[in-house]
Regions:
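A nucleotide-sugar donor-handling region in carbohydrate enzymes
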Residues: 125-184
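A short, Lys/Arg-enriched amphipathic alpha-helix followed by its capping loop at the start of a domain
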Residues: 1-4, 100
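Glycine-rich phosphate-binding loop signature in dinucleotide/nucleotide-binding domains
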Residues: 72-79, 174-177
Length: 184
């Protein structure tokens, strides 16, 4: 919004193109077509957060591209890295462990209304969270309160524009006579 340029990169590609395709495709397939399986996996991750800790097989896989990530960031001269998922946050944490002299500002934007499993296993400068009502939850998960910023979730400007109910229904393909409710 202030004219800053932001490049978007798939952090899983630093592991490998095949790993990125595999992880992304299966993640999407499971949550779309097997939501109960996705929920079970998420609940398992919540109750066994140590599966993402440094030294575990999952951590080693997710952070295995840390050196390639470092080379990419260094060669492009980036000074601010923003993660929108915990997987790149873990890889970035490992990269910073391996290269502590690299001057960067790092942050994570939590796009869930909860502290996702393994968020606290990352070590970034800032954590942007959706609401002040979640400060306690993120602190309870192990994040330092001075690193938490309740900023809301960034959305496109068009979502701030009010439209009439009739226009909204027409835009969404909902019959004007249809009674509906949106729950979040």
């Amino acid at each position: 919004s202030r004219g800053e340029i932001c490049n978007i990169t798939d952090s899983l590609q630093f592991i490998s193109e095949k790993a990125s395709t595999f992880i992304s495709n299966w993640h999407t397939r499971i949550y779309r077509h097997a939501p109960r399986l996705f929920d079970a996996g998420y609940q398992r991750a919540e109750s066994h957060e140590d599966i993402f800790c440094e030294g575990t097989p999952i951590y080693k896989l997710l952070s295995s591209g840390a050196e390639r990530m470092y080379q990419y960031i260094r060669s492009a001269g980036y000074d601010n890295i923003i993660c929108t998922h915990v997987f790149p946050a873990l890889a970035l944490t490992e990269m910073r462990r391996q290269h502590p002299c690299l001057q960067l500002v790092t942050s994570h934007i939590s796009t869930d209304y909860t502290c996702a499993p393994c968020t606290a296993d990352s070590a970034l400068d800032w954590y942007f969270i959706p609401s002040t009502s979640l400060l306690g939850e993120f602190e309870q998960c192990g994040l330092q309160p001075q690193k938490l910023i309740a900023s809301g979730i960034p959305v496109r400007q068009q979502f701030y524009q009010r439209v009439s109910q009739e226009a909204g229904k027409a835009n969404a393909g909902i019959s004007p006579a249809h009674q509906h409710i949106l729950m979040m």
